[in-house]
Regions:
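Predominantly a Rossmann-like dinucleotide-binding segment in NAD(P)-dependent oxidoreductases
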Residues: 12-18, 23-127
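C-terminal glycine/acidic-rich active-site capping loop/insertion
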Residues: 111-127, 138-139, 167-227
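Short, mixed charged/polar active-site loops
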Residues: 144-146, 169
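Glycine-rich phosphate/pyrophosphate-binding beta-alpha loops
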Residues: 147-158
Length: 227
């Protein structure tokens, strides 16, 4: 209801209303976005994002236990923005494409109720959110988005951030890597680019040169300001 109130107010007043997301400004994300916008990966077909962060050591730190309560009372991907914000930028959502269909599934709830039982003794029979939620979205132009949410089980922190294009691939977790057709790598970046292949990660030195070449203007401006 609160979200629809914002939408209705925006439409009634003819004022822009947007959801802000900080992860779009990370260095790897902005650099990869710049590469994508300049055609390095060819046509972007599929992107992935997530919020994967085991919170079992942090639940008690949230004011009035609001975060566990929210997962207890609500079902679905309750924190999609970290993953879906950068993904939407890569696919030009609302800049020529739009989300068309969505399917979301979740596992049963195990670790949430177990944590409450362990810390309070309460047996929760109706815990709403599954330990993991997986969402698949298809766009009007035939692209796909995969988003995950998991704050309940042991896993290394990850926002996934993955891009699949007709001429290349990018992934941030667990290590930052690119995979490109050799001809997509400028000879100014690596002279013997024909020795590269499209089924392995770029060598670290090539990746470094590539990221420097496609450093986003926002980061260039910030670096100049910081000098």
């Amino acid at each position: 209801e609160e979200i629809w109130s914002l939408i209705n107010t925006s439409e009634r007043t003819r004022k822009h209303c947007m959801q802000l997301e900080n992860c779009v400004y990370d260095f790897f994300e902005l650099t990869t976005l710049n590469m994508a916008q300049q055609g390095v990966f060819g046509e972007i077909l599929h992107v992935e994002g997530a919020y994967i962060h085991n919170l079992e050591d942090y639940w008690s730190s949230y004011w009035n236990n609001w975060r566990m309560d929210y997962n207890r009372n609500n079902r679905g991907d309750v924190y999609a923005t970290h993953g879906i914000g950068p993904a939407c930028q890569l696919l030009n959502i609302h800049r020529g494409d739009r989300m068309k269909t969505l399917v979301a599934v979740d596992t049963k709830a195990v670790n949430g109720p177990a944590y409450i039982r362990k810390t309070t003794g309460e047996e929760v029979k109706d815990f709403q959110n599954g330990d993991q939620t997986t969402t698949v979205i298809r766009t009007e132009n035939g692209k796909t988005i995969l988003i995950q949410h998991n704050v309940m089980t042991p896993r290394p922190y990850s926002r996934m951030y993955q891009l699949v294009g007709t001429d290349g691939y990018a992934s941030k977790y667990p290590v930052e890597e690119y995979c490109l057709r050799p001809e997509q790598v400028d000879t100014n970046v690596v002279a013997n680019h024909e020795n590269l292949n499209a089924h392995g990660s770029l060598p670290e030195d090539v990746k470094r040169e590539l990221m420097n070449k496609y450093k986003h203007p926002i980061h260039q401006e910030l670096e100049e300001t910081a000098k």
